[in-house]
């Protein structure tokens, strides 16, 4: 078995590529079902900054199959995709996921939202029955690593997020006090944006393609909510727009923005936090319009990364520590078939000899149970040390191979 991850993120692929390969939440079930054709287990992690396929495969070159799968699923030419994707195998794949969960690989160093995004990926894979023992253990280990990094280091303290970076950019152009802010999207990012901007203004309107979600979020924070059908009117009155939907279609195209800005005739800050993008990239060329997408925010995040070198080193040490624990578990899995076969072999002999012996003796049921318990205890004590030795030397499985040959173990009989 080979553990493989194939993916692209904000440092390897521009948003023009990432938005073409991103999976909307509604698309995950079909994609995961198709992934079953090449993977024994797997899951898909798709966020605004990364798209990654994790798979446990039987073939030797699982990376090639996953790259082809991604290209086919997203209808993008493989040659166009290849310069932007990375492939990690086995230990490197596990290390990568642990770093992702820790916020070390995020655009906003230490950001915590990735943990909930990994949980979402886990739930989607679980619903399509694509999670087995290995992937379940891997994801749980990654989440544990992420939590340890956040509790044992200062990495998450005063952390930047895409939302907070966007806020700082907006403040470079406008005094946000009592400004009209529009948030398009009522998911996690939308709620995070709402909490940030409430520190400056209560004149906030939330819109969503599902009005009920916008209404619930707005009611909870005592701001306004509008149906998406009123988007144009709401935008006309706005000073700052934060768009963070998962829509495959643009929420604001160039013609709409041009018409609105001609009517507004004042400064307009547009923060597009969505992948695929919600706002036509040409809108930023309009007079007095400042448009920023997630890639524009990366330089600020990189400066933040450089200032946290000590925290990063501590987090990396935790990742390596947890990776060792994973490797110990993983190596043990490789010898488990031998251990199970050895126990099954011993149990088969015990039962056969017990049956033969009991047939010759006139014992009560209680006596028969006592003899059976005695033979089980003998077998358990005889096997305890050999099985412990096989587990302890899993990294160098000579003992496992020797046991297979000595006892002529039948793995099909397990």
From Swiss-Prot:
Phosphoprotein listed as a keyword: no
Note one Pfam family from the annotation.
GlutR_N
A GO BP term here is: protoporphyrinogen IX biosynthetic process from glutamate
Report the pathway entry: Porphyrin-containing compound metabolism; protoporphyrin-IX biosynthesis; 5-aminolevulinate from L-glutamyl-tRNA(Glu): step 1/2
Domain notes, please?
Possesses an unusual extended V-shaped dimeric structure with each monomer consisting of three distinct domains arranged along a curved 'spinal' alpha-helix. The N-terminal catalytic domain specifically recognizes the glutamate moiety of the substrate. The second domain is the NADPH-binding domain, and the third C-terminal domain is responsible for dimerization.
Which family does this protein fall into? Belongs to the glutamyl-tRNA reductase family.
Protein's name in the database? Glutamyl-tRNA reductase
């Amino acid at each position: 078995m080979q553990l493989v991850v194939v993916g692209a993120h904000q440092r390897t692929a521009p948003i023009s590529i990432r938005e073409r390969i991103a999976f909307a939440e509604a698309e995950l079930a079909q994609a995961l079902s198709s992934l079953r054709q090449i993977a024994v287990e797997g899951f898909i992690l798709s966020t605004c900054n990364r798209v990654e396929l994790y798979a446990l495969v039987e073939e030797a070159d699982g990376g090639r199959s996953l790259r082809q799968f991604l290209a086919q699923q997203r209808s993008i030419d493989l040659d166009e995709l290849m310069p932007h994707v990375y492939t990690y195998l086995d230990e490197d794949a596990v290390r990568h996921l642990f770093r992702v969960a820790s916020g070390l690989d995020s655009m906003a160093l230490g950001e915590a939202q990735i943990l909930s995004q990994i949980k979402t990926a886990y739930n989607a894979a679980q619903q399509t029955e694509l999670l087995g023992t290995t992937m379940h253990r891997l994801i749980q280990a990654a989440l544990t690593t992420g939590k340890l990094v956040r509790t044992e280091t200062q990495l998450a303290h005063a952390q930047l997020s895409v939302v907070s970076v966007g806020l700082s950019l907006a403040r470079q152009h406008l005094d946000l006090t009592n400004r009209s802010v529009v948030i398009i999207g009522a998911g996690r990012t939308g709620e995070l944006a709402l909490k940030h901007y409430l520190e400056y203004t209560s004149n906030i309107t939330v819109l969503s393609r599902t009005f009920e979600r916008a209404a619930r979020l707005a009611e909870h924070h005592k701001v306004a909510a509008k149906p998406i059908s009123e988007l144009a009117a709401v935008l006309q009155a706005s000073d700052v727009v934060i768009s963070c939907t998962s829509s495959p279609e643009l929420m604001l195209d160039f013609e709409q923005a041009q018409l609105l800005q001609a009517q507004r005739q004042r400064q307009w800050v547009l923060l597009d936090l969505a992948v695929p993008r919600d706002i036509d990239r040409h809108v930023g060329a309009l007079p007095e319009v400042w448009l920023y997408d997630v890639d524009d925010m990366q330089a600020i995040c990189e400066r933040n990364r450089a200032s946290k070198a000590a925290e990063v080193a501590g987090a990396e040490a935790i990742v390596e520590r947890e990776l060792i624990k994973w490797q110990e578990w993983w190596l043990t899995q490789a010898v488990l078939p031998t251990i199970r076969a050895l126990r099954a072999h011993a149990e088969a002999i015990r039962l056969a000899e017990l049956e033969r012996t009991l047939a010759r003796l006139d014992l009560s049921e209680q006596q028969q149970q006592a003899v059976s318990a005695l033979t089980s205890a003998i077998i358990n004590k005889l096997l305890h040390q050999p099985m412990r030795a096989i587990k302890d030397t899993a990294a160098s499985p000579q003992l496992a191979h020797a046991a297979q040959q000595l006892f002529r173990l039948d793995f099909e009989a397990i």
